[in-house]
From Swiss-Prot:
Family, similarity comment: Belongs to the KdpC family.
Broad class of the protein's primary localization: membrane
Gene Ontology cellular-component annotations: plasma membrane
Membrane topology: Single-pass membrane protein
Subcellular localization(s) per the UniProt record: Cell inner membrane
Protein name (record): Potassium-transporting ATPase KdpC subunit
Subunit architecture: The system is composed of three essential subunits: KdpA, KdpB and KdpC.
Amino acid sequence: MLKLIRPAIVMIVVTTAVTGLAYPLAMTGIAQALFPHQANGSLVEKDGKVIGSSLIGQSFTADRYFHGRPSATTGADPNDATKTVAAPYNASNSMGSNLGPTSSSLMTRIKGDVATLQAQNPNAPVPIDLVTTSGSGLDPHISPEDAYFQIPRVAKARGLDEAKLRTIVDAAVEPRELGVFGEPVVNVLALNQALDASMTQ
């Protein structure tokens, strides 16, 4: 009986040691040696303090900043732990809204967002990305069109010339990966950092 069980036990121990200990430690070591910034979360610092990550979006709401896409993430209700409340860009609870195209709640929210955005820039069509959530609710990027659409609002709030602001957005556009994969994007946190930096020059 023991002869039959022993190979199975040895296999379990070896497999656990290799896949549960050796492999993770090896990958962690390689990542820390070759890509320490990425391995530690691609954190963004300002004046020695972490202000975010280039991989996770955050909620910018002030008119003087560019805004990201809507986020459907939720968090615990501080008044009732058994319930949840809206908590945009909650990195501990990545999720979409799960609302389908026939959802009245989704349509009401989108119509409200469209009306708000049209009031800010009545001379341009509202980009669809600015009224739709990403699958994770944590998308750190917007399309260049999303950023250009927001220029009038940000320029007015900061008292900046729109042409100067467009130059800042142009510089923040990240091209396709290897010139082929994906679409050009703008990292919202990086753009807002560049915007703040331009005000001190």
